[in-house]
């Protein structure tokens, strides 16, 4: 019996036996085993083919042989460069910045989202607010970060469905005063619209459901430095209002990066929120007059 190989099997074997192109092998010898960002360059001097990050640059670069698409990228590559960082945080931040700035051909494009929005809870009402109009690093009672208004309303609707909240009271559909909504008759609404549930109970359940999406307000008055260490390197990441301003080698250099941030940075928030609040890193509050306080 002859067994026919399927297409996915053939693709796997092709990638498995593929070797780095001869002209790239000289770069492999010097690849560091440290955290950082690496870049595959093609013919262009200004636009890399691909930008990646890893806690071990050498291991990650050598693993770029797993799919035919990666093999195709390697064939177009002419050289490999890298930038070492003190750890994973620095690698994540630098990768996100470089991808936005240089828009590599093989990376998913990261762009500034001018429609970035969140749900804001005001007493018993929920509004969709935009980062271009509201300072998301300071505004209270913000929940979720969404690419656009439609995504925000879909998230609110999902919460309403899960918790049997009233579409009408949430502003998702018109509601006639004194009359139950249509979903109440279907037992999909707990009845805050018609007195079966108090508005206070409805508001409490809404707040409890939104809590897992809360956007944390920037907890410091100004900029801070997060210290990240590696046996061969120490970096201080300068951050203000969840925006990464850059990295320096000493606190004395930190004031050169302190400035007024240009706006809330979604990627910075996602990368930095957990490590900044975890208590696992040394955080120093920065004062323009060089009065630093470590915490």
Curated annotation (Swiss-Prot):
CDD domains (alphabetical): GIY-YIG_UvrC_Cho
**Which biological process annotations from GO are given for this protein?**
nucleotide-excision repair; SOS response
Enumerate the Gene3D superfamilies for this protein: GIY-YIG endonuclease
Task: Return the EC number.
Answer: 3.1.25.-
| Stretches assigned to the GIY-YIG domain | 33-108
InterPro entries per the UniProt record, alphabetical: GIY-YIG_endonuc (IPR000305), GIY-YIG_endonuc_sf (IPR035901), GIY-YIG_UvrC_Cho (IPR047296), UvrABC_protein_C (IPR050066)
GO molecular function annotations of the record? nuclease activity
Disulfide bonding pattern of the chain: none
Q: Which residues form the signal peptide?
A: none
Q: Which Gene Ontology terms of cellular component type are present? A: excinuclease repair complex
Q: Which UniProt keywords apply?
A: DNA damage, DNA excision, DNA repair, Excision nuclease, Hydrolase, SOS response
For this protein, the record's PANTHER family field holds: EXCINUCLEASE CHO, UVRC/OXIDOREDUCTASE
Instruction: Relate the protein's function as given in its record.
Output: Incises the DNA at the 3' side of a lesion during nucleotide excision repair. Incises the DNA farther away from the lesion than UvrC. Not able to incise the 5' site of a lesion. When a lesion remains because UvrC is not able to induce the 3' incision, Cho incises the DNA. Then UvrC makes the 5' incision. The combined action of Cho and UvrC broadens the substrate range of nucleotide excision repair.
Q: What is this protein called?
A: Excinuclease cho
Taxonomic source organism:
Escherichia coli O157:H7
Q: Which gene encodes it?
A: cho
